[in-house]
Amino acid sequence: DVGRVSDLFAISPMVMMDDYWYLDSFSFVATKYGLTSKEKRDGVSYTNLERQGYCEITTLESGVIDDERVLEKIEEMVYQNDWEVNGICFDPYQFGTLLTMIEKRHPEWPLIEVSQTTMVLNMPTKQFRDDVKNGKIKHSGNPLLTMAVNNAYTKVDNNGMRIDKNKNSNKIDPLDAGLDAYAVCYLEPFDGAGYWTDEKILNGGTLF
């Protein structure tokens, strides 16, 4: 889920287990209008979360997110975890530059456009909600992902249901990114050959 200045740029891997999906997230934080003011406005210490490995604060003088660093982080996740990438799911808004970079460097990665509209996300959002309740989606307690879930509410219109936020400082980007992935994943059957074991997760395994 792309963010440039005010929002987070969130990467939320959805990993198939034996009988559930494991969701985690990593965010990039812009500093265009100052990190201190952003932390105060969002009510989040990104500085502390960066130390804990949940996010990365941009080092560009402009304060915007560096697409090169985003792609490097995705590559790190894939290589360190030895993933077989079945899809890079993305909202096309502001994704053009990174899309071109991925196409050039990783033509083997399927690119799947998921527009963040109610019509597209209605069924995935309903299924995501139900699957979280039924234990078919689990996550590690990631604080930025937890914050996003707490900040989100479901909005219903004539086309169905999707998530939204009450105000701009309520960040939901990690959850938006997860729903982009789940728009594809929720249709996938479990084949009993999940990527990780419960034991690895319980022993503190991390995707990052």
Where are these regions (language model features)?
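RNase H-like, metal-dependent nuclease domains and their acidic two-metal-ion catalytic environment used
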Residues: D1-Q116, N122, K126, H139-F208
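Short, surface-exposed amphipathic charged segments that create phosphate/polyanion-binding patches used
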Residues: P124-N134
